[in-house]
UniProtKB/Swiss-Prot annotation:
A Pfam entry, by short name: MukF_C
Native species: Haemophilus aegyptius
Subunit structure: Interacts, and probably forms a ternary complex, with MukE and MukB via its C-terminal region. The complex formation is stimulated by calcium or magnesium. It is required for an interaction between MukE and MukB.
Annotated Gene Ontology cellular component terms: cytoplasm; nucleoid
Biological function: Involved in chromosome condensation, segregation and cell cycle progression. May participate in facilitating chromosome segregation by condensation DNA from both sides of a centrally located replisome during cell division. Not required for mini-F plasmid partitioning. Probably acts via its interaction with MukB and MukE. Overexpression results in anucleate cells. It has a calcium binding activity.
Record protein name field: Chromosome partition protein MukF
Length: 443
């Protein structure tokens, strides 16, 4: 634990001394949120009691409650919030009119329910951009501190402070937003379950929309995290390299470790959430398909009866091809046709087993890659894959790429793998396939 953090006994004593408690019924929570929204629109951040009474009146209208004795009820509600989420100030200068301001606890609670509900790829991109700038400046300062042998004060001000009070807080905000998305996923699951239990036929389109929207949002956010994650980890490693062996800067090393763990946890849970949602998506589709299979005869017969019943309102024609085949369908002992197909298949349609393809590629790649080894030339897998995939149809690209990589890694390894730096993604075909691999330069 870094030295600026508080221990559990200290936090317990601090909360106990201030008598913190949270017991907000729905009506009081709505009242607090309304106060927070109104407070955000004011320049001075101060509110009068008349303002709070008006806000209370609006919230009661939303609950369709009586407005009788509204002033008394509003005063009771205000008194319940005072000293917990609202502070009251009064003096002789205010002539008996009290001034109200939200407490830090009130700001925190309302901020969670208002601003944290908005989680989008744009917001995440902005947050990650701010983090990248802060880490970049901190890493530059760290290298400057090493070169100039700066004092501990320099490291605390220019390296520790930005990481602790900017980067770490944004990571916590992203983590909190992910937890809110977990709640949203659960609410969507409940909504889908309710739709399917009522009328699954009418609910299919709604379920598809909810599933697709959630899958798209999760994938978009995870792509944004993945795009920035490697660069952020690389910058953190730069700072960590600067403090290695410096016992006086242990607090920075511990903070870097915490930030790396947070970033790994955020990215890992984002991918895990996608995998879990994909599993749920498949489960729902399987349920729908099963329901359709069990109900298809009744649905078809019902539609057929309706179409015949309304034939004169909306006449229709049934077009058939080879009508005698339709008559044959009534024969319960019909024998399947076993006519042999004669002639030769075009070359494009001829079957080639995967084992034959594997042997051909292995033989070719061994001859190609051994030349690299004999001449001690590095193997750029992305370039080799790109050149070789051009010789094969798209349907074989996956198997060909797998075989090439398998043969290449048997010859040697990449020194960059030991540095902890992630390689860049490189395109290997025209359909958007990419590979992430260091150059093999050690045999």
């Amino acid at each position: 634990m870094i030295e600026t953090s508080q221990t559990i006994p200290e936090l317990v004593s601090w909360a106990k001394d201030r008598e913190f408690s949270l017991n907000l019924p729905t009506e009081r929570l709505v009242f607090l949120l309304a106060i927070a929204i109104y407070n955000n629109e004011r320049l001075d951040g101060e509110m009068l009691e008349a303002d709070l009474v008006d806000i209370f009146r609006h919230t009661m209208n939303a609950f369709e409650q009586s407005t009788d004795a509204i002033a008394t009820r509003a005063n009771n509600a205000i008194n319940e919030l005072v000293n917990n989420v609202v502070n009251r100030f009064s003096s002789e200068f205010t002539e008996g009119l009290a001034i109200y301001r939200l407490t830090p606890l009130g700001v925190g609670v309302s901020d969670y329910y208002i601003r944290q509900r908005e989680f989008s790829a744009l917001r995440l991109s902005v947050q990650l951009s701010i983090v990248a700038d802060e880490i970049q400046r901190a890493s530059d300062s760290a290298e400057e501190g090493v070169e100039n042998n700066e004092s501990e004060h320099f490291w605390r001000r220019n390296v520790f402070a930005p990481l602790k009070y900017s980067v770490a807080e944004i990571f916590d905000s992203i983590d909190l937003s992910q937890r809110i998305m977990d709640e949203n996923q659960q609410s969507i699951k409940d909504e889908i379950a309710e739709l399917l239990t009522k009328d699954w036929q009418a609910a299919i389109s709604s379920c598809e929309r909810l599933l697709d929207e959630t899958s798209g949002n999760l994938r978009e956010l995870q792509d944004t995290l993945n795009a920035a994650g490697d660069k952020l980890q690389a910058q953190l490693l730069r700072i960590q390299d600067c403090v290695i062996g410096r016992d006086d800067l242990y607090f920075i090393d511990q903070l870097i470790t915490d930030l790396q763990s947070k970033l790994d946890r955020i990215i890992s849970w984002g991918q895990q959430a996608i995998d879990l949602w994909i599993g749920y998506d498949r489960h729902v589709h399987k349920f729908i398909r099963t329901a359709i299979d069990m109900d298809k005869n009744r649905v078809f017969s019902q539609r057929l009866r309706n179409s015949i019943h309304h034939y004169f309102d909306h006449p229709w024609f049934l077009w058939t091809a080879q009508a005698e085949r339709l008559v044959d369908l009534r024969d319960e002992e019909m024998v399947l046709r076993e006519d042999d197909a004669l002639g030769e298949l075009p070359e494009e349609l001829q079957y080639e087993s995967l084992s034959d393809l594997h042997d051909q590629i292995v033989e070719h790649m061994q001859g190609l890659l051994i030349a690299y080894r004999e001449n001690n030339r590095p193997i750029d897998l992305s370039l080799v894959l790109k050149e070789q995939l051009e010789n094969y149809p798209l349907s074989r690209h996956f198997d060909v790429a797998r075989i090439i990589v398998d043969q290449a890694v048997r010859l040697g390894m990449a020194n960059d793998d030991l540095s902890g730096i992630y390689p860049d993604w490189q395109a290997i075909n025209k359909r958007g396939a990419e590979v992430q691999a260091h150059v093999i330069d050690k045999y």
